[in-house]
Amino acid sequence: MDFKASGTKFKKTGKKVVPAKAFEEIVQTNRDVLKKSAFLSDLLENLQPHLNNIKKIRCVAIGNFKEDFPATYQFALLLEITDYIKSEDERDVVVSLYDPIFTKEEIQYLKSLGSKWLIEEEFSENDAIDYESVLYFLPHAPLDLTENILSSQRPHLWLANNMISHTDRYTKAKLCENYPNLSKLVHYLQTNAPPEVKKAHDVDGFATFIPKRKRKNRNNSSKLKVTPSDIDYDSIAPKFKSCQILTDFDEGKYLKEKPWINSFSDLTLHAIEY
């Protein structure tokens, strides 16, 4: 996780905040900010066609939502989503959460929200055919956790880091080696991406470093290119049939330079098909 548990009080200082108010007041203030944002409007608009199918929200890696500034905003977003489903579909949605760093206070608080709020380390969709019934919310989840869930579950709606930008530090070959399921989905996204996006993320064709003293005697055109052998994506994670981005919030413009700072940086709503 990116955030470590440390104390129970908070004031906004970098990643931490301090409560001059009660936690509920802070969350409500954050929710009021979100309600006025183009970000939330965009998200709810793109969730609207799927509301009838969503029966559960699985939220993992949210962090210490009563202590950390980003996690508090992420928790406020989770509440906005659950309330929106209730207002539109007249039903409560089940919320399944887990993070190993939850404090006793946070666990007690979640239990106080009612029987629809569950703390579950192990999570399994009851019916593989009904995979569209779960909305996954993984704010700032590490790649290992992302790969694990993609491998063990059948997520359809995936609200998490943008799969392309979150993995762009890896070559295609290295991504496939370390995170094969994620690699397959990134391949789908890049295949359907606009030309300028493909070019920006085509990290496999890079020039070999040549010391300055040797460059003097070489023509730029002679620099070697490292190109991995073609990857057989058809043989990787065959359960996946496609992946698309439903919204990246106007290429992240709705997420930047806002009161929530980096709480939602790189957040994207994906749809995975099987």
Curated annotation (Swiss-Prot):
Q: Where in the cell is it found?
A: Cytoplasm, Cytoskeleton
Extract the InterPro entries matched here.
SRR1-like, SRR1L
Give me any GO biological process, just one: microtubule-based process
Q: Which GO terms describe its cellular component?
A: cytoplasm; microtubule; nucleus
- Indicate where this protein is primarily found: cytoplasm
What UniProt keywords apply to this chain's record, in alphabetical order?
Cytoplasm, Cytoskeleton, Microtubule
Q: What else is known?
A: Present with 6490 molecules/cell in log phase SD medium.
Function according to Swiss-Prot or TrEMBL: Involved in microtubule stability and kinetochore function. May be involved in protein N-terminus acetylation and/or proteasome biogenesis.
PANTHER family of this UniProt entry?
SRR1-LIKE PROTEIN
| Family, similarity comment | Belongs to the SRR1 family.
**Name this protein carries in UniProt:** SRR1-like protein BER1
